[in-house]
């Protein structure tokens, strides 16, 4: 209460510090003036700080000290409050009195602040109540103090201190304080009632006396009399109570203990309460004593008395009813309290259940989305457009929207069952849903683009249903109205920036529109409308429209600028249904490419955000002219989209994607391994209920489509290596195909010569150097005068095409076989075509650049090393020196050289075939149709044909072999004759069989080559595969025959592979037919 005390006194002062601060009286005077203003008129100001610094107070002035303390003690004494002496503030003084005085000031101040109602009594220390003696005025306060007057009753200083110490242990409760206040009120009420009744009696007695006026003096005199009488009653009652207490103390049993005394006092109070409570309550409530009421009742008539009695009875009944009603109300309150507690517990249980239900519902939603991802089902979200400001009072066709994705449409134009239709989708958004809530449900799907998935989100619905509002938003300047397009790009930027330390992303944007079945680029600044082409499955990075501008973006500001340009360039027009109707399909494509920093893997994702133009009825939209043409194209493209959806829902083998540009753009999203989501928008107006129901039916068909689990476009390092290998193999294959085309033209010329030279069998040719059919001038003659022939199958160019793979030609021209140079030092022999029914010679073609065409010296039995690219002669009558030299060669060395060359030719060919087969599988080779399979089967020779050929071949071979081998039977033993005879017989059969098959295939293939080729697949692949299979089977049979004969003649053959028969001076060399293992064709050598 005093600012000086707050500054000088510490927070928790000691007793000496407290006494020292109050010694000058300045703080006490200031506090008293705040408690009772004007109590101390003159306060002597003096510095406080020096007084506190010195404990003996040497800095204080004696005059100031005594003047402030004297004024404070005098004012407190006048207020009849507790006081103390000046010596109590000195060292060794009693600080209890000082504290009691200050607490008494505090209690008095709080009583005044509360309004000063009733009599204030200090309950903290001893209270000495004193009354004035005879003739004195009553006290102003209910608190006695140490008074120096003669009329007051005071206690000694020692007695006061004794009682102070005694009452320090007494603590009155709040209930006793409340009872004391009630007693004071009751006494005041009794005093007022006593005084007023006395005044009433006086005025009534002096009513007829005029000499007794009514003035202030009369009232003062009357009140003084009342006070005296009331004081006398109180004094008398105090004397009675004192005598009763003294009587209790002076009992026969001796001194009572404190507990016994308190028990006796309590019993007395209870007895007095029981005696006077009833009368006192009646007196207080009814307004006076019963005697006074009885006296007044005499003045009323009997009717009034009876009425008062009835009223009294009614009042009693009302009281009883009130008591009963109050008890009932209390009982009902208790019941209601119990019911309220039960409801509270039930609500809490419901809250727990509801929270667990929502938790389970959220888990079910997440699991459902995972199942949908695994199935690849198109997710369908339905959004109901809110009414416009002027349409708020219109009837809505949406009857109910459920939390589980159900929506009920009420058709007012139908009755009973047909009036209500239920549709179920993944989720349904009502009219009050914000743009942010729409995007939250689509956010997980959009974010999967950064993981390498392809995502497509498109909006479908009739015109004016809010598709553009959902996808783009009405205003790009207001964040609350941003559509899915901008929110998706902003979210992708935020997420890509958060993953910078793991993956680096590059984001590009394309924006096109399909207007009147023409694809146009919206991100152009010059307003040009260049026509763009759609290329499905041509680009691995999702660029279906590669000619459109792909603009890289790095922040949201770039996206806003691009979207403004796109919306500005988009075709928009006004119709009767919508003032700003989109007249084209808009496609915003976001291309994302990321690279993992740890593994180096490439992630490619593509996000298509499609805003479809709304379907409309021409009679409602009132479209004419250009608007009519736009509406027709829009409806046609949406109809094509419906056909595609129906085909996908029915799992049809053919899906008509190419019926519209729109379906071509959405082909990868609807039919590929992508995550697809569709927003279906409906108009709640009654006049649009038909379009609403048809739109929801279309959405239900879309929801039933299962595209299969989406796959991430993640390219690891191994995949990139394999792709590089595939590209290199493709380039090598293209190079070999070009070489194959060059070889095909040469094969056609060789086929013509082969057909012209099928007249004479090689066994019947004259054994001279210049036969009729040999055409020796076409090939150079060797130095030793010998001439060689080559047996060659007569097949068509197309048949020969599959037998000359490009890889084989490259290997023949490459210097990878150095052993061939040592084995081919002799002049190259000429080759001859051989057939079973007719024979002819073919002009040989010399290729000096090829290593295989080097000249080879003639031996009686040529080695099994075919020379593919040249024709030369083989000597029929070798010289004796040559025969003698070849006879002395080591046969085992020739056999080893033959095996080396055969293996060197065979294994690269198998490797090439494996490579071509693997490439064919990786590229997803052409699948043969049934017609092509039947044609391939027809080309294979039947078993009956083989039987006929075997018969003819065996007869011819027997005749020829007997004529040729008969000359040798006289020169050699039977053993050699049997071996050679069996070898020629077996080889003759194989060669004849192979030649006839080749001739038959040639004629068949020549007639059917044009008719069997289709536009959709290459004409040569299936045919070559069939010819190769038949040739391989035949080659296998010939190799079996040759291997059987080769085991019996290994010991008798010279090094060059010629079977030499010698008797006497005559040397005769027998021809040997062998198949080359270097190509698919059956080629044999005839010496």
From Swiss-Prot:
Reported consequences of knocking out the gene:
No visible phenotype under normal growth conditions.
Which residue ranges does the record assign to the Calponin-homology (CH) domain?
A: 1-110
State the source organism's domain of life. Eukaryota
Q: Where is this region: Disordered?
A: 136-155, 740-858, 923-949, 1004-1087
Locate the compositionally biased regions of type Basic and acidic residues: 1042-1054
Q: What does the induction field say? A: Down-regulated by salicylic acid (SA).
Indicate the segments forming the Kinesin motor domain, all copies: 377-705
Instruction: Kindly list the places in or outside the cell where this protein is found, as annotated in its UniProt entry.
Output: Cytoplasm, Cytoskeleton; Mitochondrion
User: What tissue expression does the UniProt record report for this protein?
Assistant: Expressed in roots, leaves, stems and flowers (at protein level).
The UniProt regions of compositional bias labelled Basic residues, in chain numbering, are 1076-1087
Binding positions (ATP): 461-468
Note the PANTHER family from the entry: KINESIN-LIKE PROTEIN KLP-3
**Which family would the database say this protein is a member of?**
Belongs to the TRAFAC class myosin-kinesin ATPase superfamily. Kinesin family. KIN-14 subfamily.
Please explain the role this protein plays, according to its UniProt record: Required for keeping the ATP levels stable and balancing the aerobic respiration pathways during seed germination at low temperature.
Subunit-structure text: Interacts (via C-terminus) with VDAC3.
Q: What is this protein called?
A: Kinesin-like protein KIN-14F
């Amino acid at each position: 209460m005093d600012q000086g005390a707050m500054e000088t006194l510490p927070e928790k002062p000691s007793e000496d510090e407290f006494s020292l601060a109050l010694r000058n009286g300045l703080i006490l005077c200031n506090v008293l003036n705040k408690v009772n203003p004007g109590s101390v008129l003159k306060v002597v100001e003096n510095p406080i700080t020096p007084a506190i610094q010195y404990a003996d107070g040497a800095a204080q002035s004696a005059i100031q000290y005594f003047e402030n303390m004297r004024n404070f003690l005098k004012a407190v004494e006048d207020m009849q409050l507790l006081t103390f002496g000046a010596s109590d503030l000195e060292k060794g003084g009693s600080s209890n009195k000082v504290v009691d005085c200050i607490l008494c000031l505090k209690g008095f101040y709080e009583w005044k602040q509360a309004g000063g109602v009733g009599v204030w009594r200090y309950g903290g220390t001893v209270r000495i109540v004193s009354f004035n003696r005879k003739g004195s005025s009553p006290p102003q306060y209910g608190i006695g103090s140490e008074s120096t007057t003669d009329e007051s009753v005071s206690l000694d200083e020692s007695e006061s201190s004794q009682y102070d110490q005694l009452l320090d242990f007494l603590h009155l409760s709040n209930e006793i304080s409340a009872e004391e206040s009630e007693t004071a009120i009751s006494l005041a009420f009794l005093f007022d009632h006593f005084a007023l009744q006395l005044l009433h009696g006086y005025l009534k007695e002096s009513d007829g006396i005029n000499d007794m006026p009514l003035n202030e003096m009369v009232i003062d005199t009357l009140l003084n009399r009342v006070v005296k009488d009331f004081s006398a009653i109180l004094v008398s009652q105090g004397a009675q109570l004192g005598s009763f207490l003294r009587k209790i103390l002076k009992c026969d049993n001796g001194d009572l203990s404190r507990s016994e005394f308190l028990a006796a006092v309590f019993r007395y109070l209870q007895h007095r309460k029981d005696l006077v409570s009833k009368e006192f309550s009646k007196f207080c409530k009814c307004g006076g004593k019963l005697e006074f009421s009885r006296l007044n009742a005499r003045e009323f008539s009997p009717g009034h008395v009876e009425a008062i009695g009835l009223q009294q009875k009614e009042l009693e009944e009302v009281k009883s009813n009130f008591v009963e009603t109050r008890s009932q109300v209390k009982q009902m309150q208790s019941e209601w309290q119990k019911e309220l507690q039960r409801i509270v517990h039930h609500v809490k249980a419901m809250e727990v259940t509801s929270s667990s239900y929502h938790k389970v519902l959220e888990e079910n939603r997440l699991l459902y989305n995972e199942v949908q991802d695994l199935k690849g089902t198109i997710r369908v979200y339905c959004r109901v457009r809110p009414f416009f400001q002027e349409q708020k009072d219109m009837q809505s066709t949406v009857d109910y929207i459920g939390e589980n994705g159900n929506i009920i449409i009420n058709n007012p134009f139908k009755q009973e069952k047909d009036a209500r239709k239920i549709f179920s989708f993944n989720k349904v958004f009502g009219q009050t849903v914000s743009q942010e809530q729409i995007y939250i449900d689509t956010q997980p799907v959009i974010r999967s683009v950064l993981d390498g998935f392809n995502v497509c989100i498109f909006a479908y619905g009739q015109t004016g249903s809010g598709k553009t509002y959902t996808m783009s938003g009405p205003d790009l300047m207001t964040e609350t109205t941003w559509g899915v397009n901008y929110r998706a790009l902003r979210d992708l930027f935020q997420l890509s920036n958060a993953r910078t330390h793991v993956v680096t992303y590059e984001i590009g944007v394309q924006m096109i529109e399909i207007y009147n079945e023409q694809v146009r680029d919206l991100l152009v600044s010059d307003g040009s409308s260049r026509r763009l082409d759609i290329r499905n499955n041509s680009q691995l990075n999702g660029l279906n429209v590669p000619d459109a501008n792909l603009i890289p973006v790095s922040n949201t500001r770039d996206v806003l600028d691009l979207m403004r340009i796109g919306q500005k360039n988009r075709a928009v027009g006004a119709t009767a249904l919508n003032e700003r109707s989109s007249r084209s399909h808009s496609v915003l494509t976001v291309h994302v490419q990321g690279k993992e920093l740890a593994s180096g893997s490439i992630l490619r994702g593509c996000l298509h955000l499609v805003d479809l133009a709304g379907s409309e009825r021409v009679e409602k939209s009132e479209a004419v002219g250009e608007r009519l043409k736009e509406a027709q194209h829009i409806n046609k493209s949406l109809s094509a989209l419906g056909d595609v959806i129906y085909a996908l829902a029915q799992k049809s083998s053919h899906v008509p994607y190419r019926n519209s540009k729109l379906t071509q753009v959405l082909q990868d999203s609807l039919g590929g391994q992508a995550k697809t989501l569709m927003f279906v928008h409906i108009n709640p107006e009654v006049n649009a209920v038909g379009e609403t129901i048809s739109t929801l039916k279309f959405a239900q068909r879309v929801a039933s489509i299962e595209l299969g689990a989406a796959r991430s476009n993640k390219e690891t390092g191994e995949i990139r290596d394999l792709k590089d290998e595939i590209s290199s193999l493709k380039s090598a294959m293209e190079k070999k195909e070009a070489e194959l085309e060059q070889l095909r033209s040469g094969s056609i010329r060789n086929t013509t010569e082969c057909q012209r030279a099928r007249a004479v069998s090689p066994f019947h040719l004259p054994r001279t150097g210049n036969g009729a059919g040999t055409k020796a001038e076409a090939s150079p003659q060797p130095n030793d005068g010998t001439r060689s022939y080559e047996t060659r199958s007569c097949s068509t160019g197309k048949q020969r095409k599959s037998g000359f793979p490009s890889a084989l030609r490259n290997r023949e021209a490459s210097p990878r076989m150095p052993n061939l140079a040592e084995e081919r030092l002799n002049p190259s022999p000429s080759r001859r075509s051989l057939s079973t029914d007719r024979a002819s010679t073919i002009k040989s073609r010399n290729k000096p650049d090829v290593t295989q065409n080097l000249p080879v010296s003639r031996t009686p039995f040529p080695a099994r090393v075919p020379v593919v690219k040249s024709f030369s002669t083989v000597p029929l009558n070798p010289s004796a020196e040559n025969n003698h030299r070849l006879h002395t060669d080591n046969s085992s060395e020739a056999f080893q050289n033959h095996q080396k060359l055969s293996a060197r030719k065979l294994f690269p060919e198998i490797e090439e075939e494996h490579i071509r087969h693997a490439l064919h599988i990786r590229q997803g080779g052409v699948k043969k149709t049934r017609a092509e399979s039947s044609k391939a089967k027809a080309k294979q020779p039947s078993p009956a044909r083989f039987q006929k050929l075997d018969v003819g071949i065996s007869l011819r071979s027997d005749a020829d072999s007997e004529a040729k081998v008969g000359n040798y039977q006289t020169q050699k033993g039977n053993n050699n004759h049997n071996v050679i005879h069996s070898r020629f017989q077996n080889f003759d059969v194989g060669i004849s069989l192979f030649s006839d098959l080749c001739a038959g295939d040639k004629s068949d293939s020549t007639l059917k080559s044009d008719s069997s080729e289709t536009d959709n697949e290459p004409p040569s692949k299936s045919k070559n595969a069939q010819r190769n299979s038949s040739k391989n089977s035949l080659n296998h049979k010939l190799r079996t025959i040759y291997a059987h004969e080769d085991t019996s003649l290994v010991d008798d053959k010279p090094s060059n592979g010629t079977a030499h028969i010698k008797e006497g001076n005559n040397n005769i060399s027998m021809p040997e037919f062998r198949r080359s293992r270097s190509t698919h064709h059956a080629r044999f050598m005839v010496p």
